Amino acid sequence: MLFRSSAHAELPSELTLRWSRRIGAGDDKRHQIAAAPVAQDGQIYTIDSHSMVTALDETGTILWQRELGKSTDALKDASGGGLAVHGTQLFVTTGFGTVVALDTSSGAWLWTQDLASYGGASPTVYENLLYIAARDGAAWAIDTSNGRIKWQVAGPTVAASHTGGPGPAVSDKYAVFPFGSGDVLASFRKGGLRSWNSGLSGARLRLASTQVRDLTGQPVIEGSSVYLASSVGRMAAVDLNTGLRIWTAKHGSQGHILLAGRAVFAVSDTSNLIRLSKDDGTLIWSTPLPKFTKKSLKLRAKIHAHFGPILAGERLILASSDGLIRQFNPSDGTLLSTVELPAGAASAPIVVNGTLYVLNTRGDLLAFR
């Protein structure tokens, strides 16, 4: 079976590292790279762990850089950030609670909006509005031309959430906002009037990580349904117009979910690459992934992060913090091949014009062809 979807991209079966370019600061004890690169018209945009934005061309040449950090004190305490590109504007959210619009060709500062809220979640652009769900439980629609707030809605209070965070999903009628509490809110996208809200409750017993009940991936809208996943063992399909549950599966997600054909793919919260039926949430297959960074039972405090999956070249691709790109058969989950990374992955990969780009924990953008 061939998998074709809007997420599908062409990519050679054999991947070789073509170039590597330092784009700023990598991960450290206080800061993490929290956003995948974005691309448009032959340019790739990144944000490092200290809110440095970089634009590069497809040869790895740095075109411009812009430091968005407010101050030394802000950089000490804030991490995360998100990117979205549309037309001649690059939109950036920061961990300091600001949203910035930059000119894509020069990096010139166009406008800034201070949301006075914990930011860092990825923004979503639809027509002339920028939609943001802050990590502390608020949501905004911002005019892309001048940065003015068009409307705002208050979401649930959030005690704890993951760094960065997913962006809203937007259709012609609705904006669907994910929050760190595990709740989702749908508003009419033009005026902000609430339509419905829902939550993904769940638990993984004896796991401290389940104290953070975050929606870990961007909601995915397809037709009249929206697909959601949490960090605590729940995935669901919901009617976009009513918020009523279509199905629920006892599988969470570490990050974004991927829809392709009649399938839903994700890296589960228990570190398995899984495929579910999009129709009813039935588990089709599950492939175990490396989980703990230490083999000793006493040292199992940290787990490997697996970013993705994406679908390219008719195969599923993950980039992982253990320093490997893994490629899988989407039909049965078989591991097809691995490619070594210089240092662990820090973001989901993207594919542009037959090249795979991924950030590593050192702050390097890597290009594979």
Regions flagged by a language model, labelled:
Residues 341-369:
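Blade-level signature of beta-propeller repeat domains, shared across WD40, Kelch, NHL, RCC1
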Residues 263-278, 282, 286-327:
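Loop/turn-rich, solvent-exposed surfaces of beta-rich toroidal or solenoidal domains
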Residues 48, 57, 78, 94-95, ...:
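Structural signature of WD-repeat beta-propellers
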Residues 57-61, 103-107, 143-147, 188-192, ...:
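Short loop/turn segments that connect beta-strands within beta-propeller blades
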Residues 19-38, 65-84, 109-126, 149-172, ...:
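Extracytoplasmic beta-rich repeat domains
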